[in-house]
Design a protein with these regions (language model features):
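N-terminal presequence-like segments and adjacent domain-start helices
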Residues: 1-27
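Conserved RNA-binding domains used in RNP assembly and mRNA/RNA metabolism
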Residues: 80, 117, 121-128, 132-172
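A short linear hydrophobic-aromatic micro-motif
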Residues: 39-45, 128
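Short secondary-structure junctions
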Residues: 31-41, 83-87
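Helix-adjacent hinge/juxtasegments
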Residues: 66-69, 73-106
Length: 172
């Protein structure tokens, strides 16, 4: 996994060199677009063998659909102008990762402070709790055991390298 100015690039393992090069070029074009609007950032990007480019963006205050459309149009134009796909044989999808996708970047954790998380650890054990704080190397999770008067809440400091996945839990 490459990290570039807040952009996470996760290429498929069977990519050929030109696909990797295209992915890096598109990431560079996207970085330039995102530098104009620093409240938004790239979470993930991939290119399918059919030249279907999928870009997953997020924002510190969320990502409105209108912004997805705006980024899609601008990035599509930049890709066309770059000549990466001279025959125009590509498609582009720009969207948010979705609520069921695991958090990947520290910025995502920070924007979800105060929300319930479901964390799977490297050993496949699980904890749920409220995200209270985020630092460079770890998070603080308020984990409650028991119910009612017997409920006990403890603050767990969890290093990022112990987290296999963390997803936001939507409570209704």
């Amino acid at each position: 996994m490459n990290q570039r100015k807040g952009t996470t690039i996760v290429p498929f393992s069977f990519f050929n060199m030109s696909t990797d090069q295209n992915l890096n070029k598109i990431a560079s074009l996207l970085d330039d677009l995102l530098s104009e609007e620093p409240a938004y950032f790239c979470v993930n990007m991939r290119i399918k063998p059919t030249n279907n480019i999928k870009v997953f963006l997020d924002g510190d205050e969320g990502l409105p659909i209108a912004k997805c459309v705006q980024f899609n149009r601008k990035l599509y134009k930049l890709i066309e102008e770059s000549g990466l796909y001279p025959d125009g044989d590509f498609s582009l999808e720009v969207s948010s990762p979705g609520v069921d996708e695991p958090l990947k970047l520290i910025r995502q954790y920070k924007k979800n402070i105060g929300r319930a998380l479901h964390i799977t650890f490297a050993d496949d054990s699980v904890k749920e709790g409220v995200l209270e704080a985020v630092a460079e190397a770890d998070i603080v999770l308020a984990h409650t055991t028991g119910k009612g008067k017997k409920a006990v809440t403890e603050q767990l400091v969890i290093p990022f390298n112990n987290i296999k996945s963390a997803t936001v839990q939507i409570k209704f």
